[in-house]
């Protein structure tokens, strides 16, 4: 039998979008409008739990901050909601989720925007589906002119070099760097030159700019923020590419709001590209359990 859907539309041009969207959320909330529709023999579509001003908790890998900060602010204003974003290395974010181990904890994120695919499987039970938004390559940033003539990952093991990397337990970039070094049998040689091991890549950019390091392994998007002072050498390795997935928690009481945030981010492609990310054209949702992850980056699942 044919069914018609009852929809509510809010104009892009609306000067009071927050009030209009609040009303739409009210109409759809299970304990508000949906209950009335059900009484009137409509088949209610389950909406988000009612709140005057919902608070959406987003966990995001640090690499995404320059591309999304403005978009998150605009989304919160248009929707009349609060978006509480925790930016950190994905190792730290996953560990925090695993430590909470209970999605009823109000601090457990409603949405998760990782630095790379390899940090989704550890929490796939809560985030069984992801949309791949962007990618960025991993390379070596050096002072302008490349005074030490660094060309490859192997060159980081050269004599008297001061190298900076990210911590493998705390960050995606560190984890992926360690994976590439191990896979290339360079771990011992490069490890001997490491003078800085930090949780986020922006700290490495600051350190190389002060002259305390000769070379740092970072994402291209990190380098872009300081490209007038630095040169960037792409690493020739199949693992030197990070893909950023966005996932909404399957049991979030703000699941629809999380999906609206994703749609809002997808409308702002130009911002991601301006920050140096490459946009992924096919953004169909992928099951987290089916993400293709290189064998050297596979991690134990959440217990």
Predicted feature locations:
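Exported/periplasmic ABC-transporter solute-binding proteins
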Residues: 1-86, 91-108, 114-126, 131-136, ...
